[in-house]
Every structure is written in C-alpha cells, then in structure tokens.
Amino acid sequence: MLHSFHLARVGVPAAVGALLRPPSPGAVTGLRRLEPMAGMRLGAPVVSAARMQLHRMAVLAEWDDADALDCFFKEHPLGRRLATGWHVRLQFLRRWGSVAAFAHLPQEAARSRPGEPVVAVTLARTRLLELPRFIRWGRPVEEQVRDHPGATLALAAVRPPRTVSTFSVWESSRAMTGMVWGRDAGPVGERHAGAMVELERRDFHHEFTTLRFRPLSEHGSWEGRSDWVPPLR
C-alpha cells in the first residue's frame, strides 16, 4: 500500500470536473481511494480569492503500489494534469479519529523517530451548522501551523459542501507533536490545544481524522521549489 499527496495547477474546468466526478477505484487500476480538493491558503480571510483556489488542486490518494500511481500519471486525464505539479509519496504511520474512507487504516502501523521528517494530513466532514464556529476556532490554528518554524509546507484544501483538509510537512516529528500538544512558547503555542478542547466540548464535524505519514520521496515542484521535504537525519 502507498499513499500520495499532490499539488498542481490544473485550471478551473478540470478542477471542477474532478471535484464533481472524481476518479473511482473501479475505473482506475490500483487506486483504492482518492480525495480531490481545491487548494486554500491557511489563515486566509473567509471571503477572499485565497480561501478557495479552484485552479490549485490538492489530492490525497491511496494506491496498491507505486506502479499503480505511475500508471495513473500516464493513462488518466487527471493523472496527467497532476503529473505536471508536485507530489510526495508516503508511508502510513498512525491514525487518530476516523473518516469512513480511511477507517480501514490501523491506529498505528509504525512509529516515527523524534528527529525524522513527517507529513500530517487532517480530513474532516464538517457539520454545516457548525461551520461559523469551526472557522472562528480554526483560523487562529491555521495561522499557527502556517507560521510555525518547524513546518516547511502547510496548506488547507476544501471540497464543498463539507470536506475540509489540512496538509503539512514537518522537519521533525518532535516539532509537529510540540505544536499539537501546546508545548511551544507563548499564547500562540496554545491555540491548537485550545481548539481541541473546544472540539471535545462540541464536535465541529460528522467525521474527523488525523493521519501521520513518513515521506518516502518527493517529485516535481511547487511554488518554484522541489525541496519541501527535509532530508532524513
């Protein structure tokens, strides 16, 4: 099994088509799951062009193996568009919470070392009536992750009406867990932990999960860079 996360500029018509009619496992050999989303800048104003960027696609996918992903790049129209962008191939490590599409993953498949790079993906199916409250608590956390010195790349993605995701690359597992558990200095460091307390008080979502991965290899470029994943230490 292999996971991958993709970022690419595909144009609005292609993005809308993928959001409305994503590739299905039965139609793509070796594809197990695929979550297509529109890119979003973390911490962007609620009403702004940066909040939902249809021309920038973010895709989380699960494959039988690397050959299936390579075949998708060559043979599927969306795959060929994604191949022009950037992606990272991932080994699944841990899961917190549950979203039906990824509930088959074990809570722990392997452990990361404190000093090694990790990738974190959150995926939520939001309760629409809780959306204003989710935004109020979530935007400060978005800014915290976006500006964290230990995160080399951090962004969000959405698929209307209710799917919301974040994707972040961390220089170390230690840096990521320090942010999650509020061990960073100052009031900013408490934002994520505070939002989790509010989540426990009254859930924002129908479903929510956090997935942790080990980055295996990085391909292509995004925003002029091809070195978002730190080297193994």
Please tell me what each predicted stretch does.
Residues 1-57, 66-72, 83-159, 175-186, ...:
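Short S/T/G/P-rich N-terminal loop/turn motif that feeds into the first structured element of a domain
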Residues 59-61, 166:
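Generic transmembrane alpha-helix motif of multi-pass integral membrane proteins
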Residues 61, 69-78:
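A basic- and aromatic-enriched beta-loop-alpha substructure that forms the phosphate/nucleotide-
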Residues 157-158, 165-168:
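Alpha-helical membrane segments in multi-pass integral membrane proteins
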Residues 158-160, 192-195, 199:
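Acidic/histidine-enriched, beta-strand-rich ligand/metal-binding domains
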Residues 186-192:
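Compact nucleic-acid interaction/catalytic patches
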